[in-house]
Amino acid sequence: MRDFLKLLKKHDELKIIDTPLEVDLEIAHLAYIEAKKPNGGKALLFTQPIRKEHDQIKTFGMPVLMNAFGSFKRLDLLLKTPIESLQQRMQAFLHFNAPKNFTEGLKVLKDLWDLRHIFPKKTTRPKDLIIKQDKEVNLLDLPVLKTWEKDGGAFITMGQVYTQSLDHQKKNLGMYRLQVYDKNHLGLHWQIHKDSQLFFHEYAKAKVKMPVSIAIGGDLLYTWCATAPLPYGIYELMLYGFMRGKKARVMPCLSNSLSVPSDCDIVIEGFVDCEKLELEGPFGDHTGYYTPIEPYPVLEVKTISYKKDSIYLATVVGKPPLEDKYMGYLTERLFLPLLQMNAPNLIEYYMPENGVFHNLILAKIHTRYNAHAKQVMHAFWGVGQMSFVKHAIFVNEDAPNLRDTNAIIEYILENFSKENALISQGVCDALDHASPEYAMGGKLGIDATSKSNTPYPTLLNDSALLALLQDKMQNIVLLKQYYPHTRNPICVISVEKKDKSVIELAKNLLGFEEHLRIVIFVEHASNDLNNPYMLLWRIVNNIDARRDILTSKHCFFIDATNKGVMDKHFREWPTETNCSMEVIENLKKKGLLKDFETLNQKFHLTHSFSTHKEDL
């Protein structure tokens, strides 16, 4: 990692923070705000992390690196080769054909020879490792961060979690948040669909303890590979070798039968008693909401080893945009060829960062026959991690660039009709809070591949329309119409919820189809109708398609408000991840925050719109 830091410094992508800052909130808050600056801000190296313990201050001799992945330039520096080149290599590998002549044969031999790098190579441990075992183990000696005020504690957020199947035939590298309970216990938040969880059940059935090792740092590409959506049974370090063009060099662990890369900065080893679960959380997650307290497995740590000059790598997740935007971009590009294997008419796809990946995907396809888009929808919802996507919109090959926001929205609105909207049900991300049931909920697929026959509405200005609708639905506060020149304008309405569900009250507006097409209801207290970026983030987070959509002849009503018992939603509704104003003021006093008010208004850093406008 030291070499990567030198590279960042050379290219002006690194900011060094020498001011002592607390591992509880201060470091994470500063990194969170930095990531929202234009072009992702800088990578931040905190040289003096501290922790206040009663009347004393604990200093850590280990710097903390954050926002390391947080720009396209830093991605390029990390990869050392163009993303397009990696994508082409992946495509060539997946579409391997027998050579037709001698020249093609030589190329095939070269490609096959390059695959020798995919298998990790065993090596010995570095001799200068500092090793702590048994009673010497103390996780509290690491600068593990508490990132959000309501978090259940400190969490390791960029740990490479190494596991293997009971018969040692399958290996997995994943990334899961890891809660520090005490000196030698970590909570393992691996969800029901993760490979590690499948291995866990094997060990539980056999009634033996499961070995788990966690590595931090080293080549940052290990960390990205831990997030890669590979098919079950394919080891992520093989992907590392494919991308790097060299074998991952792995060393044996001291306490268990696993191996981890020998250049990692920190290694935590131990075992999981599969018969014991502990409450884990809450945690402010990448959805921008806190996930609730739930039981998860616990790692009993037997060994911690680290380099003398080790660096602690961490991230902060929450409301977008953050560095996972760039990590997700690499995933998009590299795995497009793999997705095309299951959906061969797929041309391109895009996961907007304010759709927080699984909540929204746009896809461009070659449409060849009636209902083709619906066929691809089902293909998406049946493939790996794509099965967790809640909302998918499909456009034809003549559509604009998927990243040209205004152009693609106008295209979709011209082609949208309720007849071409498919509402289904299936598995969803375990972090999704809007679904009525855990890990299962509604899905919405929109076929916008051809022109709609929906007639254009008779437009009213915002003031006239507001007065008309308030007469029939008294809890409406404000509204704003987007893209009024299209066939399906979007009318966003802020409401104050009382004792009835919004979807029930929306039936009072069915008589105004002449003026309405797509109507989206949001909470007045937490939304700025003039901020479409944050509106989209809240909308796709807060809806379950089967429960929260009402349709009529030409209208499509969507309830994106917070849900409760009145909405027949009986799960706990979470709060948003908001920065602590006390911490923000402390960072300001230390001269570390600039342009905070602008970023706060744009990305709702501290609290929702209706409150923050009073403080700015």
UniProtKB/Swiss-Prot annotation:
GO CC annotations, alphabetized: cytoplasm; cytosol
Matching Pfam families: UbiD, UbiD_C, UbiD_N
GO biological process, one term: ubiquinone biosynthetic process
A GO MF term: 3-octaprenyl-4-hydroxybenzoate carboxy-lyase activity
Family classification: Belongs to the UbiD family.
Entries under NCBIfam families matching the protein: mena_SCO4490, UbiD family decarboxylase
Full protein name: Uncharacterized protein HP_0396
Phylogenetic placement of the source organism: Bacteria, Pseudomonadati, Campylobacterota, Epsilonproteobacteria, Campylobacterales
